[in-house]
Amino acid sequence: MQQRRPVRRALLSVSDKAGIVEFAQALSARGVELLSTGGTARLLAEKGLPVTEVSDYTGFPEMMDGRVKTLHPKVHGGILGRRGQDDAIMEEHQIQPIDMVVVNLYPFAQTVAREGCSLEDAVENIDIGGPTMVRSAAKNHRDVAIVVKSSDYDAIIKEMDANEGSLTLATRFNLAIKAFEHTAAYDSMIANYFGSMVPAYHGESKEAAGRFPRTLNLNFIKKQDMRYGENSHQQAAFYIEENVKEASVATATQVQGKALSYNNIADTDAALECVKEFAEPACVIVKHANPCGVAVSNSILDAYDRAYKTDPTSAFGGIIAFNRELDAETAQAIISRQFVEVIIAPSASEEALKITAAKQNVRVLICGQWGERAPGLDFKRVNGGLLVQDRDLGMVGAEELRVVTKRQPTEQELRDALFCWKVAKFVKSNAIVYAKNNMTIGIGAGQMSRVYSAKIAGIKAADEGLEVKGSSMASDAFFPFRDGIDAAAAAGVTCVIQPGGSIRDDEVIAAADEHGIAMLFTDMRHFRH
């Protein structure tokens, strides 16, 4: 049974007024009586709509600079009253039923994000009446529709037209879920903000607590269910932040191909975040969350060709990311050369999409162009807890490097060193990257000892016939012993970039001098676990 409820009276009180006039006009045209408050009521009246101020309806004025508007029994009784059960008491107290509540809340997140926002500003943007009405209407969803998203306005009008001015219980229940999600996210923002202000508020410090409040409330929205998780016996889903600020795998649109898997999304994220490091046309190929080939060039076609040459075996079934539009020539090169799981780029030409369409299973994602990298938080789940840290947005330029050896790097060695340092940031620790002429030639990832990562990078280069002599090597952390330098020298590396900071730095530098290697210290580590 659909359990339809007619909408005869609606209360509208919104901070975000996008679409509210048109929605109110549609409701009024269908015979719905409009109640409203403050700025919303003034806007509707200015547009010629018949609207009753809540203060006139309740007989009680707004007061305390608008802090008290809707907190009245005639409002909440009208919302919470159970049809067929509370009718007598509603009639006794002259409480009219309110069939629809349209509310979105004070812009707390936007307020506290503004530079110079004071605690007092934040406090005044904590909505009280709004969440109370939202929760009341959601609780009584059997009789009342609660609308918190302007994106639902059109669908609601269409359903009312299809049901003689009524909404079904299924729709009201779905709207109630959205309402509880809305208030939960709102309260989470407030709790996080105040949690970060605890020391300052109690006089323990002149500074706020910082990025990490004493309780962390997170709000993510399910974007899609996965066929399964990392393995076929695990269930999984993909959740995204409500307001993603940066082009990412979360914002990407899939324009062709099979449904994305859990591993596809994880690997695509790794590839895209790596390719964002480069200003020049770049290509990153990822397999099992590790780059297996990276290159920059004057075109993405050449960048792809050079990235593929690093490790064609591992590139099979990989994820390919670009930082420029996917063009037809590059799309043809990929489709003709290899099996690929996912291609992601800021955009793709129509000709390129016609070419990839020939391989229907290939997933093509368009993420949009990104600007400056947005600061944020990284999370790592542990059993019973959550590790939280800032995103690793650390970068170094040539002017920040310290040459610690007798020999200075050549211009090409320096360029290659900076290039492979960017790549090493996205390779699982212990990470070693060999690079020459703006392309990776060997990558050693995830080994328990750094020397073995160095050896693997050399083996990879040798297997593909790539010349290591004259190359640069990046290490994501310091060398605890000289053996990693000896291994690199044996392979032909002539320049090393690493953080430094080992108690045996002197021995490591001496080893580099013995081999005639130029060594650069970044004073910044890039562990990745």
Curated annotation (Swiss-Prot):
Lineage start: Bacteria, Pseudomonadati, Pseudomonadota, Gammaproteobacteria, Enterobacterales
The EC number(s) this enzyme carries: 2.1.2.3, 3.5.4.10
Domain MGS-like span(s) in chain numbering: 1-148
PROSITE patterns xrefs: MGS (PS51855)
Family membership: Belongs to the PurH family.
Annotated GO CC locations: cytosol
N6-acetyllysine PTM positions: K287
Record remark on domains: The IMP cyclohydrolase activity resides in the N-terminal region.
Pathway in which this enzyme or protein is active: Purine metabolism; IMP biosynthesis via de novo pathway; 5-formamido-1-(5-phospho-D-ribosyl)imidazole-4-carboxamide from 5-amino-1-(5-phospho-D-ribosyl)imidazole-4-carboxamide (10-formyl THF route): step 1/1; Purine metabolism; IMP biosynthesis via de novo pathway; IMP from 5-formamido-1-(5-phospho-D-ribosyl)imidazole-4-carboxamide: step 1/1
Designated name of the protein: Bifunctional purine biosynthesis protein PurH
NCBIfam families registered for this protein in UniProt: PRK00881.1, purH
Reaction equations catalysed: (6R)-10-formyltetrahydrofolate + 5-amino-1-(5-phospho-beta-D-ribosyl)imidazole-4-carboxamide = 5-formamido-1-(5-phospho-D-ribosyl)imidazole-4-carboxamide + (6S)-5,6,7,8-tetrahydrofolate; IMP + H2O = 5-formamido-1-(5-phospho-D-ribosyl)imidazole-4-carboxamide
CDD domains: IMPCH
Highest taxon listed in the record's lineage: Bacteria
GO annotation (BP), single: 'de novo' IMP biosynthetic process
